[in-house]
Swiss-Prot record:
Domain I is involved in oligomerization and binding regulators, domain II is flexibile and of varying length in different bacteria, domain III forms the AAA+ region, while domain IV binds dsDNA. InterPro entries: AAA+_ATPase, Chromosome_initiator_DnaA, Chromosome_initiator_DnaA-like, Chromosome_initiator_DnaA_CS, DnaA_C, DnaA_dom, DnaA_N_dom, DnaA_N_sf. Belongs to the DnaA family. Residues 1-80 are annotated as: Domain I, interacts with DnaA modulators. One of its GO terms (molecular function) is DNA replication origin binding. Plays an essential role in the initiation and regulation of chromosomal replication. ATP-DnaA binds to the origin of replication (oriC) to initiate formation of the DNA replication initiation complex once per cell cycle. Binds the DnaA box (a 9 base pair repeat at the origin) and separates the double-stranded (ds)DNA. Forms a right-handed helical filament on oriC DNA; dsDNA binds to the exterior of the filament while single-stranded (ss)DNA is stabiized in the filament's interior. Keywords: ATP-binding, Cytoplasm, DNA replication, DNA-binding, Lipid-binding, Nucleotide-binding. SMART domains: AAA, Bac_DnaA_C. It is found in: Cytoplasm. ATP binds at residues 147, 149-151. The lineage of its organism: Bacteria, Bacillati, Bacillota, Clostridia, Eubacteriales. It comes from Desulforamulus reducens (strain ATCC BAA-1160 / DSM 100696 / MI-1). GO terms for cellular component: cytoplasm; plasma membrane. Residues 321-441 are annotated as: Domain IV, binds dsDNA. This is Chromosomal replication initiator protein DnaA.
């Protein structure tokens, strides 16, 4: 099998050459090679620290996808420096009942997580759950925007539990993978095996639960899995890009169960936290060519999420090294100009607002214009009307016309309701804040 994996690198390269530009392909991909394969992990050798970081952050997903499509099995990747020995783990003793563990990212631990005002509560709750599974908060529901560290905390919980409770069975899975496994089990008449796998876990971490919306069969299956684990006093940790009550087509019985435990959110990091994140990333990746003033510049200019922040650091460091130029703030401005360059003011229209709100709640624009009065549609419609009044110069009658020809009093009622709710609902406050951010991007 190992020789087969190594031999297929040429096939992988052929696929990758079609997906990236010629300069990137020759700079990054032709200079690395697979050197070992064990435990479903392909070890890829790279020439230096910069290549290691760049490949891991930018190209790992497409390399993994190419290998999996060729090999027809799931694999993981690990990048090592040229000349570095490959430490093959010794097989662990297993009990007679096999433990199922979905591979956790070794980078995502509590030690590598930077705590700030934007994530302090979520971090504390995650650590409490890791230290006392099923005794602190069950379930733990973590929500926040893309790239803010939810998955990092999920993996950190898994790592901590496994390090301190080796006999516990831990499963990390995305809702998309859970759905695909369910579909495959139905196709192959193996639903019993599928259920036994997840319902025998001690710890279940399920990421991006919002992707279960509109998937009725998957929601049904997860409902029973949740009940089985909860009644057996097993720990459940869930992440989402929004709180349970904002997942429009989520079944009420699932929503209520998610609200049984603790719900905590993660916000965009403030300036001080962004600086700390960049310094931690530089330390972990052995990046020594970025001075403090350049770190400060990047932290000031990249405010969206942690993923883009760390990507900017790697990009500046790699460019500085390859071009043999000092990593000054001026160089950073040059390298990141496509990310931070000032753009023309965006024209905000009602259709843009409706599309953004519809996407957020898992609806269609037609739903917002229709006569449906169910809460799963009526509330998002009221939010969209409120934003239309806040962000455009349209009159109430004009806004009503945009929403399927509704009367101006309907628009006024919607705006008044959302305004009133905002005064006492912190979750709605964050939702409006997030929607305004998406509309303005």
């Amino acid at each position: 099998m190992q020789n087969d994996v190594l031999a297929r690198w040429e096939q992988v390269l052929i696929r990758l050459e079609k997906q990236v530009n010629k300069h990137s392909f020759e700079t990054w991909l032709t200079k690395c090679k697979p050197v070992a394969f064990y435990d479903n992990t392909i070890i890829i050798e790279v020439p230096d620290h910069f290549s290691k970081s760049w490949l891991a952050d930018r190209y790992a997903p497409i390399i993994k996808q190419a290998y999996e499509s060729i090999m027809h099995q799931e694999i993981s990747l690990q990048f090592i420096l040229a000349g570095q020995e490959v430490d093959q783990p010794k097989p662990k003793e297993r009990s007679s009942e096999e433990t199922y563990i979905n591979i956790l990212n070794p980078r995502y631990t509590f030690d590598t997580f930077v705590v700030g005002n934007s994530n302090r509560f979520a971090h504390a709750a995650s650590l409490a759950v890791a230290e006392s599974p099923a005794k602190a908060y069950n379930p733990l529901f973590i929500y926040g925007g893309v790239g803010l560290g939810k998955t990092h905390l999920m993996h950190a919980i898994g790592h901590y539990i496994l390090e301190n409770n080796q006999n516990l069975k831990v499963a990390y899975v995305t809702s998309e993978k859970f759905t695909n496994e369910l579909i495959n089990s139905i196709r192959d008449d193996q639903t019993v095996e599928f259920r036994n796998k997840y319902r025998s876990m001690d710890i279940l971490l399920i990421d991006d639960i919002q992707f279960l919306e509109k998937k009725e069969r998957t929601q049904e299956e997860f409902f029973h899995t949740f009940n089985t684990l909860y009644e057996a006093n097993k720990q459940i940790i869930i992440s989402s890009d929004r709180p349970p009550k904002e997942i429009a087509t989520l079944e009420d019985r699932l929503r209520s169960r998610f609200e049984w435990g603790l719900i905590t959110d993660m916000q965009s990091p403030d300036y001080e936290t962004r600086v700390a994140i960049l310094r931690k990333k530089a330390q972990l990746e052995a990046i020594k060519n970025i001075p403090d003033e350049t770190i400060a510049y990047i932290a000031d200019k990249i405010q969206s999420n942690i993923r883009e922040l760390e990507g900017a650091l790697i990009r500046v460091s790699a460019f500085s090294s390859l071009e043999q130029r000092d990593a000054t703030p001026q160089l950073a401005a040059e390298v990141l100009k496509d990310v931070i360059a000032p753009s023309k003011p965006k024209i905000i229209t009602t259709p843009l607002i409706m599309q953004t709100v519809a996407d957020f709640y898992g609806l269609r624009i037609e739903d917002l214009k229709a006569k449906k009065r169910t809460r799963s549609v009526a509330f998002p419609r009221q939010v969209a009307m409120y934003l239309a009044r806040e962000l455009t110069d349209l009159s109430l009658p004009k806004i009503g016309d945009e929403f399927g020809g509704r009367d101006h009093t309907t628009v006024l009622h919607a705006c008044d309701k959302i305004t009133t709710d905002l005064s006492s609902d912190p979750v709605l406050q964050e939702t409006i804040k997030e929607l305004k951010k998406r509309i303005g991007e």
